[in-house]
Amino acid sequence: TRCLYIIGAKGGERRKVASHTTDIQGYSWKADGTRLALLATEPVAKDKKARQDQGFSQEIYEEDAPFVRVYLQHMDGGGGPELLKLEGSASELHFNPKENKLAVALAPSPGIDDHIMFRKVHIVDLATGKATNLNNPGKLGQLAWSPDGKKLAMITGADKHDPKEGRLWIAGTQDQTFLKLYTPNKRHVESLAWTSPNVLWHPGSEGTRSFLEWFQVSQDPKTGKLGIAETWGQPNNGTEVFGHISAATVNENLAIVCHTPTHASEVYLVEGRVDGRGFRRLTNSNPWLKDMKFAKQEVVKYKAKDGLELEGVLIRPLNEEKGKRYPLVLHVHGGPESHYSNGWITRYADLGQVAAARGMASFYPNYRGSTGYGVEFSMKGQKDAAGKEFDDLIDGVDHLVKMGLVDEKKVGITGGSYGGYATAWGSTYYSHRFAAGVMFVGLSNLVSCAGTTDIAQEMFLVHHRKWLWEDWDYHIKASPVKHVEKHKTPLLILHGKNDPRVHPSQSLELYRHLKVRNQAPVRLVLYPGEGHGNRRAASRLDYNIRLLQWMEHYLKGPGGKMPAMDIDYGIPAPAAKKTASLGWDDRRGELSRVSDRAEPWLGRGCPCCIGW
């Protein structure tokens, strides 16, 4: 990825237009085709590289992380990329379509905490080198220039305590003032795209539903002040959940990624911008799904004990029998600044329709702290870790029991990251409510987590709102390890060995305490090379099968002793590829082939990864 090539729209030979000494992480092409802006890390100094080649491979934690810089490349081929001197580490850049300006997102350092919490949008005048900080108020999402180059739209947080970027703001380039479009309401913006100089489309979420909307933006020609001339939009009454969007300014058509309860993400075409517009599906990535029978999926509303209205997505068991109670798998999303939509929710870490086909229900609650219900709702869990937010999960289970669907003695809980934290809490503090737990990359000790996570500022600003040393009791009481004596839930713990976000020691701590107490079965599975979530197909398949196996064993099967450690993946073993290995032949006095060995095979892709 150290070279950039272009190929004509009608095909032909590729042509190299840029190269760099480190990986090119992103680029933007000037509208007139004369220049490229590149994102790449700083090259390693020659003397440092020489020392590394000598074996000096020490890391200076956080200090020696390379900054991502912006480089400019002329398309005429004259010379290599030139460094654009800017303060900070860059992560996103967009050429202004009409002016010699560049919008760049800059963080104070290359660290992930600064990237998440403190990225600011800068408009750089390439003629003078002056960079103007727009000072967006919170977390930063997508950026997009209007086609006339006079407005810059962005998805941002309402302030530094807003847990997730989801507010739509527009900056005028004349006075660098914001037009706040979405601060008052409950909708959460997912993406944005301009179809003309003044029309901005944006899909997003309102609870479990999806919506698609556009604004017609006005701008005073003298003062540059922005306003809203017209709006159109409504929640989607169909089954599609809208995601990323892109626009063609020539005909104002849109391409948008959508998923539904019966298919994973596909590309749709939206023709025109008026009510009753054309809307049709363009791709079909998994045609075999049309032959599958799907269980009923629906939105369930319920109230928490304190009266707060909540909702979640329920997948009923396939071929459900009236009056019969079923096992339930409670899926808890991470964040908690995220949410479940009523679309495709069967993934490698979420059993969904797979569980339904095995005679189990699945419930996906949007507990307090979730996005899609307004900034105020998403902040309700702050300063109250493992408090009412996790009580909401129990209230959801109780509601399903009262509905007559769920057997309260056969409820399992699972989730990753913050959902893993909820699983650890459910398997200790609320252990009397759960017959099985599968915890993934989750927190177990808020005290030690505070010193090992790479997002300390985010944990402070949008979660706890207090530092460890300011309230030790709060952090201790909200830690699952504080409640291990209550453990009765068979717990499967899984974690990536290279997780920088929630250190694997969080799983090791909980495992060791539960193992020593020996009050219920516990197993720990570590994935080498994986971080905060599994990326490799083999790791995902292993996780998916272990999750399903654990839930079936303890919710439907005999329970008791843990299921077998080894997994049957249900895939044929490939023919072994034999390679020669070399050894010293004493008789011949030379290196020669002394044995053959079989190289392991890694599977490529699996059904459990669809839609992830």
Give the role of each language-model region.
Residues K324-G334:
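Short beta-strand element of the alpha/beta-hydrolase
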Residues A31-D32, P97-K98, P147-D148, T195-S196, ...:
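Residue-level detector of Asp-centered blade-edge/turn motifs that repeat once per structural unit
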Residues T1, L36, L102, G149-L152, ...:
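Hydrophobic beta-strand positions that form the internal "hydrophobic ladder"
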Residues G8-G12, H74-G78, D125-G129, G172-Q176, ...:
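Short loop/turn segments that connect beta-strands within beta-propeller blades
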Residues A37-A40, K46-K48, E62-V70, M75, ...:
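Non-catalytic accessory segments flanking enzyme active sites
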Residues Y348-R358, Y364-V594, W601, C606:
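Active-site-proximal cap/loop segments of hydrolase catalytic domains
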Residues T1-Y5, E13, S19-Q25, L39-R69, ...:
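A flexible loop/linker signature enriched in serine peptidases of the S9 family
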Residues S28, H94, A144, A193, ...:
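Conserved beta-strand position repeated across blades of beta-propeller domains
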